[in-house]
Amino acid sequence: MCCADLTNTCLEVNPDGHCLFAAVADQLAVLGILPRTQATYAVTRTAAANYIYTHPDDFLPFLPSIDGEDGVGATDAGFMTPRQFGIYCTAIRDTAVWGGEPEILALSRAYNIPIHVIQSGTPPVVVHNPAGTPDHDDGLDGTKSVVRISYHRRMYGLGEVGFVVISRIRC
């Protein structure tokens, strides 16, 4: 599946560490969920960080500790401490650290909208549903508003990860 299959077009986003958040912000503005003046990576970074911070039980089991369970001298199960969790949330909010699955899920829930990540791998569309699991109302049938972004690994051959905004083609 590609953008053309979905009658969409791709718009490039600067691969600067904020690309995921910038792509989602753009789509939220296109869908009328955020005013264009507020559709910035800083706003979506803050939304993701705040959601994760206020819902630690939904995220802590999936976030590895700084040292990891296999790190030299590690004696714990590899989970973040409360202090590390706070540092992690602050980094998501205030730095250009890359976002991933936890941040996409947080954005989907914070804005109560499915987020589809289109990629070249399997599965071709990764659905993040605010309810937590894909269901019949996840936007795959085209009847519901959905944020669509495309994931590109090493798009420029430099090893970076980029997200591209997927917008409906306007006729």
Predicted regions and their residues:
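Papain-like cysteine protease catalytic cores
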Residues: 1-127
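Structured partner-binding subdomains within large eukaryotic complex subunits
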Residues: 118-171
